[in-house]
Amino acid sequence: VAQVIALVGTGLSTIALALLAYNMAGSEAGRVLGIALACKMIAYVFFAPIIGGVIHRLSRKSFMITMDILRAFIVLLMPFVSEIWHIYLLIFLLNFFSAGFKPVFQAVIPDILEDDEQYGKALAYSRIAYDLENILSPTLAGIGLLFFSYTGLFVFNSVAFLISAVIILFTILPKSKHVERSGNVLNEISYGMKAYFKTPRLRSLLVLYIGIALASSMIIVNTVIYVKDYLGETDSSLALLFAFSGLGSMLMAFLYPKLAKIMNDKTITQLGIIILSISLFYMSIEPSLIFALSAWFLVGIGLSLSQIPSGKIVNMSANPKDRTAYFTAQFSLTHLCWLIGYLAAGELVLLFGFGFTAIFFGCIVVFCYLYSVLFWPDEDSQNILLHKHKNIVHTHTHDHDPHHEHHNHPIETTHEHEHHHPEVVHKHPFQIDLHHQNWPKH
């Protein structure tokens, strides 16, 4: 519920930001919006890994509530913007705090829902919430704009963040698992990134996110330019295109639990990428509102199919104790893709036009798909790999588990002492962690 309320509020601000950029920059609104969203991505890319490295030392509930309150304050400042650089600064600060909230929220979900099927449904429902925002926000924005200026939408977003904070305050969250990690704070901050890049399926997923980001950027950055300058339509058409994209995405979110029973997550993700490439080529057709509605609908379908499984893919790749570090790495790296996408979408359309940019992005998406076909391992359906552990003696905090079955220490809770791991060859669901620092080579 907190997510839905915050998302609807954010959706109102997204539309208000597009209108604010157009009012201040005119035909260069795409460039202004692209740079503003790049500021958002910079905050995501550089702040999220820091949170991933230290969040296990903090209360997750208190942290998320604090982030919501700070976001509410920043959004309230939006109506007072008078210079373009004000937009850039406030967008950076707003998303500096969002970069703390979102990956922690994502990592909490599998702690609450440990069953894989239920977690998959939760991801689908989360996507539905996101898509309801795409559908409801333009509608609510359109109604709101009949009675007040777009600056009022920022006020509604601020209230939404405060409501989200109150809901989280009264929500019971499970205690986070103890983290088995050695080293200083810098090592902890970089841990998630290192583990992410050592996992083949996650490297392939990241390449696919390049394609996802490019398709998404065309929608987010250039819809206002496409509607105003290419179609000559009004603000209502802008809201309509966003709504059609949300409808396509929500349709696939409803169907995902059924698809997951007959297709694996790798196949579903790749199918989404194929649809995104088709939709980008489709966008290059002569500008028409009818063509645009169908193209935006296809993009929504592709974005939903390609992104919903990512949570399960990251979750299966991570030791539960390291889950937040993996999710923050995923959050940071994928938003780096969006950073590049936003800048490229704004500049290329301005320099070469909408049609050329759509075709160029479509070709890159095809390349991303081919990479995943070649380098995403097939054994991921089970994630059980044969591997060898070297003989080692070390010290770190740990619990008694299959890798720590010694009984020379009486404490059954988390404890720390020097202990020995003999050389062993075995197989089990494999994740990069303190005791599995490199992916097995076959």
PLM features: what roles do these ranges have?
Residues 266-307:
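C-terminal transmembrane helical hairpin of 12-TM major facilitator-type secondary transporters
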Residues 107, 111-112, 154-184, 374-384:
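Helix-loop junctions on the cytosolic side of multi-pass membrane transporters
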Residues 57-68, 261-273:
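Cytoplasmic membrane-interface "Motif A"-like loop-to-helix N-cap segments
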Residues 69-83, 274-287:
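C-terminal ends and interior cores of transmembrane alpha-helices
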Residues 1-14, 36-55, 59-74, 86-146, ...:
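Substrate-agnostic recognition of the 12-TM MFS/MFS-like secondary transporter fold
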Residues 16-25, 78-80, 136-156, 229-230, ...:
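Transmembrane alpha-helix termini and helix-breaking/packing motifs in multi-pass membrane transporters
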